[in-house]
């Protein structure tokens, strides 16, 4: 069976293959002769990085999982300054992390082509917001390409390298959840000889302080260069192979569709049976090419702009039309919603209203049927996996802390601790935010902490932050230093499951693994000690009693306590055992001992445990049990017994 990673490296120009959008981006980078790739994983961009990790050594590409997006951007940037083609990929909020360097570098430019892939998440399927990268690019005056198909996702990367080098400026490839994760036909192009031979490429950095040092005297003239360069891109995009006009030349109405919205518009027009509309397909939402706009607007009386999220194209078109004195009725966000992702339904409804047509489908009737289905189908909220070590950590923490404890948390699987029965997540904002929020609360609630001590005598802390291992290295370190330096009074629990689990089991500095072989492992507890934390301990969350006792000690210490809860991600570990042909333990309920107290369900909440309403007993689904033994530790009646031995 052929692996996708083999297909991505196929030396078969003209071959038609099926690829994920993110996999196609990697193929495009290889066809573009990439030399360096660096990224921090983040959904929906993660498969780009994982695919590159799988092929990099064979293709002669230096590839790394960086500690965060800022570091990844700077790594790729410096490779570009040394003359190599380089790429980084991140989710949309990852660009916020890289923003400081990103905005400064916009004035400096690049040498080798530099492509910044940013995967937006309209509808927030796995993100905390749905910010539009096109708006950020417009603010920064950085050009944006946006694919409408998997084929374009591949082809645009090579094109981006070329125009980046031509004009000496980085280029953003903006994708979305759908364009990242859709599959489609891709016709493979030619691979460069260096990629086929797997030869590492090395560059040459030529010193030029006036360009590369960002003191005001050097930077001041570059703003003008930035503005002049974006206009060169605008001119370039008039002839871009990813922009075109289709439909009858004598049409009176037109639709502008950037990126993936083009695919929805084409489907919507087919649904509506409309063929007398002119369509401007835009693969370059910023800057919009004015020459192409002039051609498109000829003979039109009304125009609709169909785009996801912010009116980035709409605003550019309206400003251009106003400045040109063009008297054409232009619609956009008055008909197309500004929130959530584009769908065929949304495109159909907007275009139908624009054209004064009835929709071919009764969507209201579908909505009513959907509501009825929702009433029948049991809800399936997300849950921590069976045997997830975080469940045990949360259970022990909640038991050890005062009832009034506050739990700032972070971005990762463990955010699911917000749900019952664990309820040990009170705030999340961004990667690394847990420690900063915990510190701020300790300052704001210092009097409350003293009062709590007097009332309960239960610990010197009421604030316990939780943060994952990868997140700790991502942006937790500065916040920890700040908390220690400013004598905060918090407990920080680092949930170390020995992998970057939520985005697909990628390595991080705490694992010591890299795509090219062993790296140097950095132990979280040693970092905390070196920073001067007042209490540092490491626990195995599969030992709930030990974890509980350690939390009690940590909560008694005045100052910053750091507890590292270390145990491999259960999902990752089970995968290892399956591949090795080994089995894991399984537990079952001894019905003679079970009293039906429901502590295992109402306080612990493992999804492998369910309630038998007839027998009024707890039961374990053997197909879901992964044998951590947490249930046996929390049951006060010893009703859970191991029925199969194994490793975990």
From Swiss-Prot:
Keyword match Metal-binding: yes
Positions contributing to [4Fe-4S] cluster 1 binding: 594, 597, 600, 635
InterPro entries documented for this protein: 4Fe4S_Fe-S-bd, 4Fe4S_Fe_S_CS, HACL1-like, IorA, Pyrv_Fd/Flavodoxin_OxRdtase_N, THDP-binding, TPP_enzyme_TPP-bd, Transketo_C/PFOR_II
Annotated ranges, domain 4Fe-4S ferredoxin-type: 585-614, 616-645
Entry binding sites for [4Fe-4S] cluster 2: 606, 625, 628, 631
Cofactor: [4Fe-4S] cluster
Protein EC: 1.2.7.8
PROSITE patterns xref list: 4FE4S_FER_1, 4FE4S_FER_2
One Gene Ontology term of the molecular function aspect: 4 iron, 4 sulfur cluster binding
Known partners and oligomeric status: Heterodimer of the IorA and IorB subunits.
PANTHER family: 2-HYDROXYACYL-COA LYASE (PTHR43710), INDOLEPYRUVATE OXIDOREDUCTASE SUBUNIT IORA (PTHR43710:SF7)
Function, as annotated: Catalyzes the ferredoxin-dependent oxidative decarboxylation of arylpyruvates.
Protein name according to UniProt: Indolepyruvate oxidoreductase subunit IorA
Protein's gene: iorA
